[in-house]
């Protein structure tokens, strides 16, 4: 079975079993909805967890799980990763992509590979920002906007970027 990583339990929140999830998923409001099932990776074994409450909080997503109604029951899971079955992702419109399809793609500028998309983070209401890991240089932050990201080929794991002048500083 294929698994899709959706986040990790960063910490507990309060005394009633609520946890802070650092999301690594598209559409966290949909992914962490009440009644949804996530799978916690406990020493290589996937433990099924059903969400009983969800609310966004700052950069985290606060969730409680069925059967874990106090801090003592859930605290041992801090730092563990959460997954969903890969077949539980829905089809997207043309020119929309899941994070897992973009992360790991080579970033190409003027025909030259400059690095690999290592992470994606959301901004409040604006475009996503891609983190390009560049060997021997600082990471480049690339806004996911049409004028910068020219081409995406998820099958070839390749994205073509035309950076705005000054966006990529090679003087590291």
Swiss-Prot record:
One Pfam family it belongs to: RimM
GO molecular function, one term: ribosome binding
Family matches, as Gene3D superfamilies: PRC-barrel domain (2.30.30.240), RimM (2.40.30.60)
Compartment(s) where it occurs, according to its Swiss-Prot or TrEMBL record: Cytoplasm
A GO CC annotation given for this chain: cytoplasm
UniProt KW keywords: Chaperone, Cytoplasm, Ribosome biogenesis, rRNA processing
GO biological process: ribosomal small subunit biogenesis; rRNA processing
First and last residue of the signal peptide: none
Domain PRC barrel: 93-167
Main location (coarse class): cytoplasm
Purpose: An accessory protein needed during the final step in the assembly of 30S ribosomal subunit, possibly for assembly of the head region. Essential for efficient processing of 16S rRNA. May be needed both before and after RbfA during the maturation of 16S rRNA. It has affinity for free ribosomal 30S subunits but not for 70S ribosomes.
Record family assignment: Belongs to the RimM family.
Subunit structure: Binds ribosomal protein uS19.
Notes on the domains: The PRC barrel domain binds ribosomal protein uS19.
UniProt protein name: Ribosome maturation factor RimM
